[in-house]
């Protein structure tokens, strides 16, 4: 069975841990003849190759029309050339579109109209934070242009996937997709890099590497650290905890202002390891007792859950409440130094409460956030 992942709304890049990289790789593992069609500005004339995961990648020639250089017209012009012809050549059984925000997607609709038996799925990552509707013109633009694309896709799509509850809501209220066609498809962690069977050994090894006692209560956080991530508040909250057995492990790049604020506070119990790759994140999660992500969302939230880790997260008015699978997570609306301190202290002091969270994290949430399971759900296979 042949599946084509259509990645036109964004540029396709190899070697990243994004959903558009991982889902096709998982479909290869599941035995599907897996293709990606996209574009990359380094290959203006297009190219074809098979990558290390066994995915057949076709980068289409870029549309170099003068209209693509005009700010107010660029969104009305196709980014690529030859998408319909590519579909005609490959004749997929399944199409999975990553993001509908490209006029090129209408070429897929045209092909689906001709081939009624194809199974079409669409996901999207836009929400009220990363694609804010701050002007009437923006709202009209999204509703008219992207709403039209969504309407055409709705004629053929089996399912529109939002990757968070917020993005499910956005599909319906902004793009006008009918609720019965929308569902949640979470992001997750790549089980290929999660050494679950040897997690105790991984835990011991990582803690030795960073000089963290084996019996310490280890909190972890990180990512692209700017003020919106609120990791500076987490550092202050941990500093206030009098229990010397608590440690905080932070990873990721810091903006200049966060470096100036946070780095003087890095000491014996607060560890900073700098930037690490997405693959290197998983052992750190396995070595930890609690993740805390008190700011803006990133896929690190779901990656920590895929490692069976209980967590504390910022509550964005229910926009990311999918992280709670029945008790593995605490969601805090008002993130302050004090609210973080209180909740971390609570879990340290109340072992029964923490153990219950950990059990749910390991035996329920973990499976839900593994990409092999997400890849099956994405295209309705068992």
Tell where the protein language model's regions lie, with residue ranges.
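N-terminal subdomain of nucleotide-sugar transferases
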Residues: 1-45, 49-56, 239
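Conserved donor-binding/catalytic core segment of Leloir-type glycosyltransferases
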Residues: 4, 161, 213-229, 235-238, ...
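Donor nucleotide-sugar binding/catalytic pocket of nucleotide-sugar-dependent glycosyltransferases
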Residues: 119, 146-201
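Glycosyltransferase donor-sugar binding loop
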Residues: 189, 222-226, 247-260
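Nucleotide-activated donor-binding/catalytic signature segment of Leloir-type glycosyltransferases, i.e.
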Residues: 259-280
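Short alpha-helical donor nucleotide-sugar binding micro-motif in glycosyltransferases
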Residues: 275-276, 282-288, 304
